[in-house]
Regions:
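A generic structural micro-feature
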Residues: 2, 45-47, 84
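Short, surface-exposed ligand-recognition loops at beta-strand->loop->(often short) alpha-helix junctions
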Residues: 11-23
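An amphipathic, aromatic/His-enriched active-site/gating alpha helix that lines ligand/cofactor pockets
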Residues: 32-39, 56-91
Length: 100
């Protein structure tokens, strides 16, 4: 098993409310848990409005499977509707160190 980090950076659409977005992102948890591969998730935003969604997955396959299905899942629609699509960048990376 190779723990995989999924790092997605993006901006919200103009006028999108950060609190509403964070709630919509939290409402995706059942879907993410259903995948069976999510370990943990952190969502942050910097002072310039760049958001980072950082999810640890049990494997690269689990990460890619979830990424492929998230756009069609009804639980993800409110969250995805607030993201400026062209600003989004996703990458996956092998985790070499994890400290709690």
């Amino acid at each position: 098993m190779t723990t995989t980090a999924e790092i997605v950076t993006f901006r919200l659409l103009p006028g999108a409310d950060a609190t509403a977005f964070a709630k919509a992102a939290a409402d995706m948890e059942p879907f993410l848990q259903e995948t069976g591969g999510m370990i943990c998730r952190h969502l942050s935003v910097d002072e310039d409005g760049l958001w980072t969604d950082h999810i640890l997955w049990t494997s690269p396959e689990a990460a890619k499977k979830a990424a492929a299905s998230v756009m069609e899942h009804p639980a993800a629609q409110p969250c995805m509707a607030m993201i400026d699509g062209p600003s989004a960048q996703m990458r996956h990376a092998q985790v070499h160190l994890q400290q709690e």
